[in-house]
Amino acid sequence: MSSGQSFSHSLLKLPLSALVKGTAIPSNPIDDHHIDINKPIVYALPFRSAVDLLTLQKHALELGLPDPLSPLEIHGKSLKRYVFIASRPTLVQSDNDVPSDSIALFSDLLALHAEDSELDVQVIPATVLWGRKPGKEGNNKPYLQAMNGLQKAKAVITAGRDCLVRFSPVVSLRYMAQSHGTDSSIAHKLARVARIHFSRQKLAASGPDLPSRQVLFARLMKSPAIEQAIEEEAKSKNISMEKARKEAQDIMDEIAADFSYSLVKQGDRLLGWLWNKLYQGLNINNAATVRRLAQDGHEIVYVPCHRSHMDYLLLSYVLYHEGMVPPHIAAGINLNFFPAGPIFRRGGAFFIRRSFKGNRLYSTIFREYLAELFAKGYSVEYFSEGGRSRTGRLLPAKTGMLAMTIQAMLRGLNRPVTLVPVYIGYEHVMEVATYAKELRGKRKEKENAGLVLRTLRKLRNFGLGYVNFGEPIPLNQYLNEHAPEWTKDIDPMGASRPQWINPVVNQLANKMMTHINDAAAANALTLCATALLASRQRALSKDSLIHQIECYLQLLKNVPYSKTYTVPSESAEALVEHAISLDKFVIETDTMGDIISLDRNQSILMTYYRNNIIHLFALPSLIAQMIIRQENLTVSQIQQQVAEIYPFLKAELFLSHKEEELDELVVKVLNELVSQDLISLKADKVAKNQANTLTLVLLGRTISETLQRYSIAFNLLVSNPELAKADLEQKSQDIAQRLTRLHGINAPEYFDKGVFASLFSTLKQQGYLDSDGNCDSEKTAQFATLLYALLYPEVKLTIEESVFQLKSA
């Protein structure tokens, strides 16, 4: 570096340190991008800019990366550690050519690779973005453009606190040299590729240009589908075309978002304060996968589970802080009340009625609006379950939005569309007490400003929040596999609804929900709730609770559930202490130590948190229950019984393991139970270890309530094979409700109608009922006997008596 450059850099550092507070994306690029700091590193920046270079230097050093201003020494040659892909324009000219010194550096590096087969220089593309405000539609400026000195000074002053430093995945010059050679033309190609890459980085951070709402509405009104719907509306209601158009305009105004970057920017500060007040921290996992999709130009559709109204804010906040554009969010029309509605709308929410069946004009406009969002490249978010889960379990997907997404693809989108399942978890859900009341029959309170204010008064520390991005589902690839000729149905007019859509959407919905559950986050509260609710008295000594949590942790770590779920890194003791700090348990002390318990009200509320992760333990719990309730089992018998019961658990809990994987999985679970000294395995015989029976019993009881529900339904069918679907569901509910009173079962979902409706579908899929609803009596009786063997005697007796009474009535 020349003395002049060194002096100018020194002059710039002081004002930059005061004005610039940037955010590095990702926050840990060494791990996220698998950067090997022992190999030579060169940074590539889009434009010649001392300000950008110094901003990059500050963040690189903070992140443990080499100083971009330090020389790179290779085989006795001293080289620059940074390159600019384009020259900085002055006030009177603009130069988009690649600087000659950058080409020279690339050429030198490629030549060194030709001489040394072991050399591998890592090029890290780095973009310094000053503000993330999207452009306006109709403005034909490039997404990323250089600034002259005055423009850069203004950007530093106005957007220095909104600066992003994006580190992209490394480009291996060894790979480039081996794949494309080492002549000088490759240096030019490398620079051109980098320029495209930088534009995508800006697009991923700011999003597409935004239209004014009136321009958007005018464009939608010219849609042939909407024009036809308006004509039909006028005819069917016998009103004028002008009145029908006004009705269409009103519907558009009701639906459409009015995205405001300034509100998002200001809201980020408010949300930052809110999360710090509410939560001790946010754990975010697998965001790098989503960033890659955004950078590669995918149309991203976020499909999170729905726990709380907080979900709307949390996911947008997380995406913004991960350097991505907050999505346009499908929100229920019930949230369109003052003042929340206008704020949500400017934050990207578009509103959807709970039902618009039979309203052709509304459904057409909504479908066209959604297709417009996809066509323009805006990321979209809709909640897969339709509404918030009141039980903590993942609900079956509502498929309407998913079907409209597929229909939008049939317009001929020119970008790949990818679903990104998202698991959202909390150690405290603000509405959980309300959910319990609603499940007991209390009418849902309509959302309003008063409800918001009452909620805000309850703000306190709610522990940790979790956002886990699941395995993406590329829709183009999915359709290629499940509807190979789908491209033949592409119709730019949007009239296509081929016959294959419904079955494909139903399969896709199930896959989507499974991927959400695959990304579950176990945490201190969900684990402690699972253990305490498995105890008959909802109480355990502190030592027993710690021991049980340790059992869960070892199972989750040693028998992995999926690639995307997360397990706490803390010890069992630390997790129990953290859960106690959340003030949800009753703590009593005697001469032998602390006893941790749940009162009746908290027992009901804790089922919500247990249900968040019950699927993670479904199979280990089932195996433990088999060992506890049956003597002298062999491994093969356990495998056979698991194979019979698993399809019901898989359908209800969206489990991901395939049936052909079960035998191997059973062996892995058994081996883990052996390593924990809970059971012994001798000559294929399984026996429980009497010294550690409590841990095994608690593990088994996690799934016992689910098995009880199955037993109720199957014993009703054995008693009366001709029961119709509605009767089976109602009688099952009645018996389940009776069991809750007689046996102190506090789970509100225990007699939920939806659970029994799902069970009925699985009965048909597994051949216990044929397509006409006729029962296979022998098969049903055998399965009922198996389920009975897994129940405790007192529960078994209540089911027998209840079935007999209903039959006699």
From Swiss-Prot:
Any coiled-coil regions, as ranges: none
Single annotated GO MF: glycerol-3-phosphate O-acyltransferase activity
UniProt subcellular location: Cell inner membrane
Domain of life: Bacteria
Topology in membrane: Peripheral membrane protein
Protein EC: 2.3.1.15
HAMAP family attached to this UniProt entry: Glyc3P_acyltrans
Protein name per Swiss-Prot or TrEMBL: Glycerol-3-phosphate acyltransferase
Species for this entry: Vibrio vulnificus (strain YJ016)
